[in-house]
């Protein structure tokens, strides 16, 4: 039974503090779609996704209306395409294999537009130890795919705590991101490419979502968003000790998560599929007040990025997890605080005044999910430097047994002090400086950084 105060509190959260369900993502298994014939493969994929996901948008809108809770994005994630291309590309030349992968990606884009979802994720490869031929071709095809599609997101898992870091793949992904930046408008294609360590199989958030090989046939995963709500709570705690702040954030996260699970289960029930997880991640938007940086500043920092930022973020992330885990037994995905620069108005301001630099963002990723996200850098940045930034982030994830990722955008013709405007959820990215010193010799070595001693857990 809800008391009137709780109902009023929820209305306030939605109306004034930007509380919403960021995404309901339908994960779909495509392993049974594999076929030697490319046309049959595409037909199988089309039939499977449209039959299971054709009503996703309509259903999510209906549930949103029923509860009065906005569901901002409706998305689909699929089995990593690298896992189902083997028989299709067997015997083809490299060029033909790349084109076959792109055709599958174009089919995914067509489906996304037909069913009305915002994005479709799963143009992915899992290459933490080595890449198969079809995965190499899929990775090579990513830049071309980004010029021909609007809604397809690509991700590549290049490292895990158990396997170490595949430095060949890290080198290649730096080159792929660089090439994509040069052939898509304002390097927008790079905003749809994520490089992962320890990628979760049930992530509902783009651009890194895919339907993991250990998942069932179809599942709904939900992601919540409530930085504005948390900030409003913290602002009422002036002068209180940090333990009290943590406790109040925990209580707020409980309420947010409970709402996410309610909506996710309802959408799953209506679609006749299983409910998977609710992702506890606090996901910011470019809207004023809907910012992770603003929460940290409300805790007591003059600007996000100053000394103490990592400690405040660690407290926030831990409190959100504790509150969320109490609210739901089905917690998964990334589940932490996102720090995407272009999507967070407070982060953008911190970069502008010189408080927040790439090195500090890297330190922050040690204590939160998911990594260096939506970072715009000068267009002249060499591929080897992009790879080195990725390698650093992969190392943090590997050693700390957590998910880390890089979504970095070298913007042609732009330099430090410039901006690139994407609009919508992707926001505005200030160009951030990178080191002028080279990492090329390290990246050229290739090989695999061995798994750390903490991987030996048996």
From Swiss-Prot:
- CDD domains recorded: RNR_PFL_like_DUF711 (cd08025)
SUPFAM superfamilies found in the cross-reference section: PFL-like glycyl radical enzymes (SSF51998)
Highest rank taxon of the organism: Archaea
Known InterPro entries for this protein? Answer: UPF0210
Q: Which Pfam families match?
A: DUF711 (PF05167)
What HAMAP family does the database record attribute to this sequence?
Answer: UPF0210 (MF_01221)
UniProt protein name: UPF0210 protein MMP1427
């Amino acid at each position: 039974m809800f008391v009137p105060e709780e109902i009023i509190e929820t209305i306030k959260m939605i109306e004034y503090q930007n509380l919403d369900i960021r995404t309901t993502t339908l994960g779909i298994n495509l392993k049974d779609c594999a076929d030697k014939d490319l046309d049959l493969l595409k037909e199988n994929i089309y039939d499977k996704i449209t039959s299971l996901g054709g009503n996703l948008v309509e259903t999510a809108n209906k549930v949103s209306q029923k509860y009065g809770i906005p569901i901002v994005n409706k998305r689909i994630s699929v089995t990593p395409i690298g896992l189902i291309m083997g028989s299709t590309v067997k015997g083809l030349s490299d060029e033909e294999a790349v084109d076959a992968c792109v055709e599958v990606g174009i089919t995914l884009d067509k489906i996304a537009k037909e069913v009305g979802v915002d994005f479709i994720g799963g143009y992915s490869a899992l290459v933490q130890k080595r890449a198969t031929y079809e995965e190499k071709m899929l990775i090579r095809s990513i830049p071309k795919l980004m010029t021909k599609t609007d809604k397809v997101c690509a991700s590549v898992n290049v490292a895990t705590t158990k396997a170490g870091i595949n430095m060949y793949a890290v080198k290649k992904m730096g080159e792929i991101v660089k090439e994509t930046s040069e052939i898509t408008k304002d390097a927008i294609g790079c905003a749809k490419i994520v490089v992962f360590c320890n990628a979760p199989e049930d992530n509902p958030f783009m651009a890194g979502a895919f339907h993991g090989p250990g998942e069932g046939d179809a599942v709904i995963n939900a992601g919540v968003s409530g930085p504005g709500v948390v900030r409003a709570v913290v602002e009422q705690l002036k002068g209180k000790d940090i333990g009290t702040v943590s406790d109040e954030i925990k209580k707020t996260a409980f309420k947010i998560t409970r709402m996410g699970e309610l909506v996710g289960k309802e959408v799953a029930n209506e679609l006749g599929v299983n409910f998977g997880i609710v992702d506890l991640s606090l996901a910011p938007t470019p809207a004023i007040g809907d910012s992770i940086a603003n929460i940290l500043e409300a805790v007591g920092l003059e600007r996000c990025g100053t000394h103490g930022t990592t400690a405040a973020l660690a407290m926030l992330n831990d409190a959100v997890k504790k509150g969320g885990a109490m609210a739901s037994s089905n917690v998964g995905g990334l589940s932490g605080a996102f720090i995407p620069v272009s999507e967070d108005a407070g982060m953008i301001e911190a970069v502008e005044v010189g408080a927040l630099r790439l090195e500090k963002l890297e330190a922050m990723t040690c204590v939160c999910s998911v990594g260096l996200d939506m970072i715009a850098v000068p267009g002249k940045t060499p591929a080897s430097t992009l790879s080195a930034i990725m390698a650093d982030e992969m190392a943090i994830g590997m050693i700390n047994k957590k998910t880390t990722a890089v979504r970095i955008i070298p913007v042609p013709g732009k330099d430090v002090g410039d901006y690139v405007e994407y609009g919508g959820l992707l926001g505005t990215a200030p160009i951030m400086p990178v080191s002028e010193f080279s990492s090329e010799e390290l990246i050229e070595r290739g090989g695999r950084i061995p798994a750390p001693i903490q991987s030996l857990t048996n």
